[in-house]
Amino acid sequence: MGVEGCTKCIKYLLFVFNFVFWLAGGVILGVALWLRHDPQTTNLLYLELGDKPAPNTFYVGIYILIAVGAVMMFVGFLGCYGAIQESQCLLGTFFTCLVILFACEVAAGIWGFVNKDQIAKDVKQFYDQALQQAVVDDDANNAKAVVKTFHETLDCCGSSTLTALTTSVLKNNLCPSGSNIISNLFKEDCHQKIDDLFSGKLYLIGIAAIVVAVIMIFEMILSMVLCCGIRNSSVY
């Protein structure tokens, strides 16, 4: 016997929420793939300074996002099918998956909040080491290539106004093509550009996580209400 009345409304409401959840999973997967292959971050995080690679903490978070997006699409489909079929087993499985996903999202959110400044900090340290080697040692070709990539990608020169002046005077070939001492002094420094690059992307990820968490809470409530409604309708 199918559900009737308010329970039937909840059934279709849950279907709509699950469809939105499935779409959100697709969006997160798409955004994660875009962040993974974004030219700016790819240019910077694929660099190597001697035997030392650029920090990859940012990519760890991106790979987690890719996995989350794929799982969300599967769970969203499971919820849609369970709601339409009025299956307590599928809805119970769906609820369990949601609880696990929600717990993982909370854990990832805490990790992200704790490490939100660490990613940019590690990249800035990597850049500073390369810049120091490039300015001091004329034969440090690897370091020069790393610094040049940072400067061309971010359109900056030096980690501060002082280093911008020093680099422009001593090693102007490390600065972006077509720049001069005056233009370099009025540009944002590379430390600020690195902060802006990663904080903007982390802000986008944070908004997506909050939206998904709200949807998941509603889905958990609706799935349990529908499950109880199906059980009661089968009794009568």
Swiss-Prot record:
It is a multi-pass membrane protein. Keywords: Adaptive immunity, Cell membrane, Disulfide bond, Host cell receptor for virus entry, Host-virus interaction, Immunity, Lipid-binding, Membrane, Receptor, Transmembrane, Transmembrane helix. Expressed on B cells (at protein level). Expressed in hepatocytes (at protein level). Expressed in monocytes/macrophages (at protein level). Expressed on both naive and memory CD4-positive T cells (at protein level). One of its GO terms (biological process) is positive regulation of protein catabolic process in the vacuole. Disulfide bonds join 156-190, 157-175. It is linked to Immunodeficiency, common variable, 6: A primary immunodeficiency characterized by antibody deficiency, hypogammaglobulinemia, recurrent bacterial infections and an inability to mount an antibody response to antigen. The defect results from a failure of B-cell differentiation and impaired secretion of immunoglobulins; the numbers of circulating B-cells is usually in the normal range, but can be low. This is CD81 antigen. It comes from Homo sapiens (Human).
